[in-house]
Every structure is written in C-alpha cells, then in structure tokens.
Amino acid sequence: EKGYFCKKENGEYFVAGVWPGKVHFPDVLNKEAREWFGNKYQVLLDQGIEGFWNDMNEPSIFFAQDRMDETFDKIAELKDKNLDLDTFQQFTDLVGSLANNTDDFKKFYHNVDGKMMRHDKVHNLFGYNMTRAAGEAFERLSPEKRILMFSRSSYIGMHRYGGIWTGDNKSWWNHLLLNLRMMPSLNMVGILYTGADIGGFGADATEDLVMRWTQLAMFSPLMRNHSAMGTREQEVYRFDHIEEFRKIINIRYG
C-alpha cells in the first residue's frame, strides 16, 4: 500500500520467482522502503540472532512472471505440432532463457528521490542498498552490538555496512586460485571482510582440495565451508584426516 516494491513501467508490481516462489522485490533504492526493509531484521534480533547472510540480492531471477506466461502460451502453440529441429530448438530456448534473462532486468523500476529509474541502469546498486538497509538497521536496532552481516552482491562503499563473499564457486582447483586472486582485488576497492566458500559450492569436492582451501581460508576474514544441495558432503569431519584439519583450524583460533 505504500509502494515499497519495484514496479513495471505501467505501475503494476513486478512479479518474479526465486527460492520461495513468486515474490516482489523491495525497492531498496527508495529511502523509506530501505528503512522499512531494515526494520524487518528486528524479529530475528529478538530471537538472539547476531549473524546474517543476504543472498540472491543482485537480484537473482529464476523467472519473471510475464516471461513465464509468454513461455506457456508459446509452448501451448507448439503442443500439437510436429517439432522439427528448428522448432525443437525454439522450444528448448524458451525454457532455457527464463532464468536471469537480461531483458527482465529492464522491465522493473526503482523510485529514486521521486524519479523512476529502470533497474538495469542501477543494477549494481541494488545489492549495495540492501546491504545498506541492513547495516543502518543494525545501528538503529542493536546499537550496543556489532552485528555480523555479509552479502552476495554489492558495490564500492558497502564496507561501511557489512562484508561480502565471492559467490557461488565450484569445487575446482582453478577456483581455489581464483579465490586467491579475488580477495586482494576486493581489498583494493575497500572491501575487507570477505572470503569464499571453502571447498567450492558446486560440484563434488575432494579431501585434498578441501584441505588446501581450508589452509588458505584460515587467513581470510570470512572462513566458511559451504556447498550446494546434491553435491558431496564436505564438512571437514566427513573426511579421513580429521586431525590434520583440526591442526589447520587451531592455527586460526589458537
């Protein structure tokens, strides 16, 4: 009722699908909406939670409802047809283009000081302002504590409000090297609290890879082992050389 969600050009609310299904995106570039969103952390703070992880805040789009509706209509047209090669490729392209379609980021707008701004023009500021919403809220709601918060998406200047992790990596040796390269790059733009998913997020990790990654991560501010559903369980206690892992972790906390 207060217009705190992102809208389409015609004034209707933009509907997208992510983890919980259909959602609206909070317009965190709108100052009032940013404060409203930040205040939502109160219920979690009241439960004694002192660490937060802002994910999917590019924002990620599994599908835009308008594009999904168009896709279903086109699939219905193809249902009773004999799908030759070209038509079959059109069919697969329809479904394959649903997630994070660049055109969908041009379909919704932000209210920036009373001016409607198309999202793709300010894309990197969405994650930044979500981080800002949280950081400013923690100062208001819990001034006596320094609340831990890190984000997947953000922008230069976000170090005032929280940290960042390097996103969904893979359980590959070259992504271990990439972790080593990304951290100083982030440091050089002022982002100090950072780290990567130890062992890689996607694909199956080996014990050797997790051990080497843990050795690197003990020197990073954020030290977190994290993996995707459907991949090999990679908590360090699931491997054979538990004592070696214990020694590495003790160096950090000893």
Task: Please annotate each region the language model reported.
Residues 1-254:
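Catalytic-domain carbohydrate-binding cleft regions of carbohydrate-active enzymes
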